[in-house]
Amino acid sequence: MDTTPAAPDASFDLDPAEIRVLGVLVEKAFLTPDAYPLSVNALVAGCNQLTAREPVMALSEGEVQAAIDSLLARRLVSRRDQAGGRVAKYEHQLRLRHSLPPAEQAVLALLMLRGPQTPGELRSRSERMHRFDDIAAVEAVLEHLGEKYPPMAAALPRAPGTKEIRHMHLLGGAEALEAAAEGLASAAAGGTGRGRLAELEEEVQRLRSEVAELRAAFDTFRQQFD
């Protein structure tokens, strides 16, 4: 396994297949440690699960292998060659690359595999990976992920008709965050009153400003390695 130190990612811009593969590796390290690290076939099965996945995907072996190769190049995944083993197996490197303890790995895996969620949803769904004493503990993890450089999670504007704020991962880059905000604006246009729509438009504008700040921070960080 290559252990040569690498510069931290200046920004995240993983595609959906890469996010799914990375999320599966983190999840299975918790849930099936005896079968970890994972082969390509095991990763295909995990990526295309019909449960605990949003959205459900149908990735081919070639697509999964391409995602693995990209993650290997980013040092987010490594290959582990086992004595006497003929099949290549892979493990994630989030703990080493981004100093993520188990609680943060569990929350990030859920966000990668199931999309934006509330702290309450994250607490209940993380039970098999990491037990949180209360919602405040989840919120503390989300806050810490958001304070990383570059940030790994962010809060979304409150969706129409809901009381709780959802959080999403930022491994897809600032564009993914902006797309999520645009989706909320579209949902608002479908069935909310003018007052609520104006409120949501203000929230989207605020989020766009945060995206611009994130991009500026990414550019500044990237210049350190040019």
UniProtKB/Swiss-Prot annotation:
Q: Name one Pfam family in it.
A: DUF480
Judging by the UniProt lineage, the source's domain of life is Bacteria
**What SUPFAM superfamilies does the annotation carry?**
Winged helix' DNA-binding domain (SSF46785)
List, alphabetically, the InterPro entries matched.
DUF480, WH-like_DNA-bd_sf, WH_DNA-bd_sf
Coiled-coil segments: none
Q: Which HAMAP family match?
A: UPF0502
The entry assigns this protein to a family as follows: Belongs to the UPF0502 family.
Q: What is this protein called?
A: UPF0502 protein azo0627
